[in-house]
């Protein structure tokens, strides 16, 4: 099993798909990496040589911010927005959508499950 940047790549998947298991590498970047290394698109991870793995590792480390570094940078940028008390930071703090989406009827993913409120009792 190939291990790149602390991530075990699945053996039976194509290299292009297996690289997407690394946080910060999607399909386009994975295709670009495979092209730079010279790996055919149909090659599976189990068919990689140590030389291929070393080349992939060097390309990823040199050109991309991935895994812990990327997660840390994203977290710090969100924390910076929250410290600035700007609109986006306030939305992050309240757990609401940040990019202007409607919250009257949707946004359940961001807001979490419904919190039901009891009805008021009528006076007799």
From Swiss-Prot:
Residues 95-124 are annotated as: Disordered. The keyword rRNA-binding applies. Keywords: Ribonucleoprotein, Ribosomal protein, RNA-binding, rRNA-binding, tRNA-binding. Disulfide bonds: none annotated. Residues 107-124 have a biased composition (Basic residues). GO terms for cellular component: cytosol; small ribosomal subunit. Signal peptide: none annotated. One of its GO terms (biological process) is translation. GO terms for molecular function: rRNA binding; structural constituent of ribosome; tRNA binding. It comes from the Bacteria. SUPFAM superfamilies: S13-like H2TH domain. InterPro entries: Rbsml_uS13_C, Ribosomal_uS13, Ribosomal_uS13-like_H2TH, Ribosomal_uS13_bac-type, Ribosomal_uS13_CS. PROSITE patterns: RIBOSOMAL_S13_1, RIBOSOMAL_S13_2. Located at the top of the head of the 30S subunit, it contacts several helices of the 16S rRNA. In the 70S ribosome it contacts the 23S rRNA (bridge B1a) and protein L5 of the 50S subunit (bridge B1b), connecting the 2 subunits; these bridges are implicated in subunit movement. Contacts the tRNAs in the A and P-sites. Belongs to the universal ribosomal protein uS13 family. Part of the 30S ribosomal subunit. Forms a loose heterodimer with protein S19. Forms two bridges to the 50S subunit in the 70S ribosome. This is Small ribosomal subunit protein uS13. It comes from Bdellovibrio bacteriovorus (strain ATCC 15356 / DSM 50701 / NCIMB 9529 / HD100).
């Amino acid at each position: 099993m190939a291990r790149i940047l602390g991530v075990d790549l699945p053996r039976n998947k194509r290299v292009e798909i297996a690289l997407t298991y690394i946080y910060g590498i999607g399909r386009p970047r994975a295709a670009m990496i495979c092209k730079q290394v010279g790996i055919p698109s149909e090659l599976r991870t189990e068919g990689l040589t140590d030389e291929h793995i070393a080349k992939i590792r060097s390309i990823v480390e040199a050109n991309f911010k991935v895994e812990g570094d990327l997660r840390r940078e994203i977290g710090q940028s969100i924390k910076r927005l929250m410290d600035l008390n700007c609109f986006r930071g306030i939305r992050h703090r309240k757990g609401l959508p940040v990019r202007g989406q409607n919250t009257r009827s949707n946004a359940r993913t961001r807001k979490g499950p419904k919190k039901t409120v009891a009805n008021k009792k009528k006076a007799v």
